[in-house]
Amino acid sequence: MGLRLLACLFHLPTAVIYGSLSLFVSILHNVFLLYYVDTFVSVYKIDKLSFWIGETVFLIWNSLNDPLFGWLSDRVFLSTQQPGAEISSPEVVLKRLRALSHNGPLFAISFLAFWVAWAHPGLQFLLCLCMYDSFLTMVDLHHNALLADLAVSAKDRTSLNFYCSFFSAIGSLSVFMSYAVWNKEDFFSFRIFCIVLAFCSIVGFTLSTQLLRQRFETDGKAKWDQESTLKELYIEKLSVPQEKRITLVEYLQQLSRHRNFLWFVCMNLIQVFHCHFNSNFFPLFLEHLLSDKISVSTGSFLLGISYIAPHLNNLYFLSLCRRWGVYAVVRGLFFLKLALSVVMLLAGPDQVYLLCIFIASNRVFTEGTCKLLNLVVTDLVDEDLVLNRRKQAASALLFGMVALVTKPGQTFAPLIGTWLLCVYTGYDIFQRNPLSNVVSAQPKLESDTILEPTLRQGCFYLLVFVPITCALLQLLSWTQFSLHGKRLQMVKAQRQGLMQGRAPEIKMI
């Protein structure tokens, strides 16, 4: 039985195994996003100064580690070479799989460090965030880079992304299961739950990467034997020019001239900000806009569905991408976000059912857009390769440079959101505890009753004006992005030509 199961796993399509890696990230990361702030604020009682110091250091490290790890991984690919040099090979894929097989289990172990008090809350908060983000960055960089390395055509990349969304949706079920064990007064059951999740993630990373490595090691060995003979003939007959090594400064200069990259990161910075704004303030909106109008189970359902629906919705968006292209779908989602926000603003905060739909759909469509943008980055990888005639696509490095510019949006979201709320209403999350009862209606103190109308109005304005502003700025940036239509087809054709460019040289020899 065990051998038959292993045989079935070995014959799974590459896209399925690649997509399954998203499952082993999402089962942990969704739980982390939902509970880490509440754990340190409500359970470990971190003070306000330590919290902001930790977030500030995390902002810096979170922005720098993506390009740093990307540069360390892909700097050897930046050298230029004569036309006809091979662009993609099993060795590149194997390098990324080895990185995933090492960093995946370490990522799962770092996840466990949050749920046991082992140091001063401020120190533990800082160390846990930086350690967790480091391993998550390594996993994300190489997993995303494989999307560009395993396929070139939009159809194949869409298929890979489809399975990522499918498995991410399954991984989001961990959020629903966590409700059964989450108890700030008794952490034992939640800790056991997290240990089980981490163990599943470790086993999954190990098994999936091993299956993919076996598959590409077989292909790589055959290809290596063939290339060794061809290189000997090539060296005997022709002199090969020395490769030109690209320094970091030269690479940054190349990126600064990459017009589509610049417009994309401007748009994506706003998108990352909006995604994390929704995640950070979703519980607050539920508490102060809906808690006295909906039941606890309804609030929990809205919170849970907001985590799983983006992945399921993305399966439909990907089918639209196959038909209309990623650019058109993303532009349509920006217009949809703007239209829904304007309708909600005109309707006002007293339309309960419309408010429920808007709060949930705002997060679902925003997260869905984020998940499509990896396809755009892979197109930028192709354009970067063609424009700069690289011998190999520096996929992880370009994903890292995108993150360098856009990841500050993760930290700006809670900072700007809490600042706007405090300026408008005088509400301070460190003096009150809005997360102590996210979706339930408890008896309010007299001071709370006085503050509630202003706080409710402030939450509503944040809810509608942030997406309106984001949508307008994103549409402005996205209209300047030209890597779609005929230009994208031309870039794809040139990269395919480079990949097949060795064949004419062999015939000449």
Curated annotation (Swiss-Prot):
Q: Which residues lie on this side of the membrane: Cytoplasmic?
A: 43-54, 117-124, 178-189, 288-300, 346-353, 425-458
| Transmembrane regions | 11-42, 55-73, 99-116, 125-149, 154-177, 190-221, 260-287, 301-320, 326-345, 354-388, 398-424, 459-477
Please name the Pfam families in this protein's record.
MFS_2 (PF13347)
The superkingdom listed in its UniProt entry is Eukaryota
Q: How does it sit in the membrane?
A: Multi-pass membrane protein
Q: Gene3D superfamilies per the record?
A: MFS general substrate transporter like domains (1.20.1250.20)
Q: Which residues lie on this side of the membrane: Extracellular?
A: 1-10, 74-98, 150-153, 222-259, 321-325, 389-397, 478-509
Q: Which cysteines are cross-linked by disulfides? A: none
The record's annotation in CDD domains points to:
MFS_MFSD13A (cd17481)
Q: What are the entry keywords?
A: Cell membrane, Membrane, Transmembrane, Transmembrane helix
Q: Where in the cell is it found?
A: Cell membrane
Q: Which GO terms describe its cellular component?
A: plasma membrane
Cited PANTHER family: TRANSMEMBRANE PROTEIN 180
What is the name attached to this protein's record? Transmembrane protein 180
Q: Which gene is annotated as encoding this protein in its UniProt record?
A: MFSD13A
